[in-house]
Structure formats: structure tokens, C-alpha cells
């Protein structure tokens, strides 16, 4: 269950970035391709994929993620009374679930992680629109025969 919300304390922010230039149009239709990170205590936590069976979580300076993403907005998710060490413990625990080789564009992406971390810290979920495109694509993926779809993640080596 999420930590108790407080009106005072350390703010938790959800930082949202555009992944594509077409987001400026898609956003107004309730869609878009976004990267998200969670900022707390001057650190931004996010999730990305790699080919190893270890945590895919990484920490950056706030508003300075890797890659060519463009900052869109920050949403204050609430304030917490947790210590930096307690936050680190929560992030480390999530790192056991969010392994780099488990990244999947539709079902286990940076937005899923950000939602989970926001909930663990504040008891509030991230806005649904940040991952709406992945959710819609997941439904389409389930409706189409597998041979019609290319794999979204590379197959594991034998």
C-alpha cells in the first residue's frame, strides 16, 4: 500500500517527456508516446530496457534523462514524509521486478514503473493518459494473429 499523503514534506513529481514530435497533435486526442520519470529528493528515477537479468532502473539529475526526449510537464503527485533511505529501499525493491531484460514497450515500460513508484510513495497513480497508447496497442496485439506482429522485444539467446 502507498505511503500516507502529507500536505508538507518532500514533493514527489512525475516528469513527462515527449518521445516523438507528433505528440503535439496526438496529445489533444488523448494519445501520445511518453517517457516518464519520478523525481524525489533531487533524483529522477526511471526504467529502461537492456539485455541483462538485473534491474533496469536508473537515476538521473531531474529533467535530464538520457536520449532525445523533450520535456512536456511535471505533475506534483503529493508530498511524503519518507526518508531518502526509505525511498531508496522502495526503488531497490521495484528494481527486483523491473529488470532490464523484462522491458516491453506495451506491457512493462517506463510508464508502468513510474506509476508503480508514484503509488508506492504517495498512494496516487500516475494519470492514465501517459500510457494510453501502450494500453490500446496491447489490446490490438491480443486481437491480431501472432504471425501478423513483429516481436517488440528481441528473443532471448538460446
Predicted regions and their residues:
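Non-catalytic ligand/cofactor/substrate-binding and regulatory segments of enzyme domains
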Residues: 1-108, 140-158
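Short glycine-/small-residue-rich flexible loop motifs, especially phosphate/cofactor-binding loops
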Residues: 35, 92, 115-116, 134
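Active-site nucleophilic cysteine motif
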Residues: 102-122
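Alpha-helical catalytic/interaction cores of small GTPase-regulatory modules
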Residues: 111, 128-131, 145
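Short conserved catalytic/interaction loops centered on acidic-Pro-aromatic/His motifs
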Residues: 121-133
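Post-kinase regulatory C-tail/linker adjacent to protein kinase catalytic domains
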Residues: 135-139
